[in-house]
């Protein structure tokens, strides 16, 4: 009887160990889950923060960094991170863009594919986002995984989408006013009536004489402080008129506001 008992005990233990081994194999399967993570391109670092998988950006200051009104796309860097074991072969991750309910969808350019190299568990990619076509309106896009065309499966639920929000909204307070109407009230006697296009063109035009964003805004400050002869002097006005002439000569239609009003500067 003792021999039978010992035999049964040994068999039970073997069964238990075998069950544990099978469970481990099931847990670490060949399919890897994937998640979005934050990628800080300036530092080349990743950050797993599922509560902040989003980017918000206002194009307005970019006019001061360019000499034309045709702004380049804004580049958004995004990271991806695998769950589970390292892979001994490269894994293809495909992403796609989806609309966000209630918002105009951004026009974006996505990479053909993202590759997580063998022995790695992270990779990053860039989304090129065009400037919204309408001023002062937020546009959004949702970047998600395209699992039908990827070598991976879904990872953690909270890390399956990345939201990009862009706008081209005038920052009136940087020009020391609260609105376009107040801009015209304060500055039109010196540089003429303005609209959304004109206030942006001023930045790009003055960039041609190496004025940066803050420097251009200082011209408004001088007017506010009662020193109009210090702001928008003959030098700045000559530049604005010259650049406007150059723009109109190089485009099929002269520079105009969305309602068709031509952009002009006083002589």
Region spans (language model):
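Short proline/glycine- and polar residue-rich coil/turn motifs
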Residues: 114-122
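Sec-dependent signal peptide recognition
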Residues: 2-10
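C-terminal motif of bacterial Sec signal peptides marking the signal peptidase cleavage site
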Residues: 15-19
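Extracellular recognition modules
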Residues: 142-144
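Intrinsically disordered, low-complexity regulatory regions in eukaryotic proteins
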Residues: 21-91, 99-106, 124, 131, ...
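Active-site-adjacent structural elements in folded domains
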Residues: 108-113
């Amino acid at each position: 009887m003792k021999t039978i008992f010992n035999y049964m005990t040994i068999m039970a233990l073997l069964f238990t160990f075998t069950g544990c081994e099978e469970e481990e194999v099931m847990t670490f399967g060949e399919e890897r889950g994937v998640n979005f993570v934050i990628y800080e391109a300036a530092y080349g670092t990743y950050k797993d923060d599922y509560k902040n998988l989003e980017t918000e950006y206002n194009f307005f200051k970019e006019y001061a960094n360019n000499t034309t009104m045709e702004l380049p796309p804004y580049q958004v860097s995004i990271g991806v991170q695998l769950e589970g074991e390292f892979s001994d072969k490269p894994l293809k991750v495909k992403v796609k863009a989806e609309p966000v309910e209630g918002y105009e969808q951004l026009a974006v350019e996505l990479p053909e594919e993202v590759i997580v190299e063998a022995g790695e568990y992270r990779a990053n990619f860039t989304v090129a986002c065009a400037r919204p076509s309408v001023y002062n309106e937020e546009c959004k896009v949702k970047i998600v995984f395209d699992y039908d065309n990827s070598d991976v499966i879904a990872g953690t639920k909270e890390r399956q989408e990345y939201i990009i929000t862009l706008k081209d909204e005038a920052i009136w307070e940087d020009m020391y006013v609260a609105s376009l109407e107040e801009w015209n009230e304060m500055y039109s006697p010196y540089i003429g009536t303005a609209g959304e296009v004109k206030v942006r063109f001023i930045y790009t035009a003055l960039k041609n004489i190496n004025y940066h964003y803050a420097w251009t805004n200082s011209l408004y400050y001088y007017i506010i402080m009662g020193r109009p002869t210090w702001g928008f002097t003959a030098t700045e006005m000559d530049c604005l008129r010259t650049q406007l002439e150059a723009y109109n000569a190089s485009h099929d239609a002269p520079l105009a506001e969305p309602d068709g009003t031509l952009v002009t500067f006083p002589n």
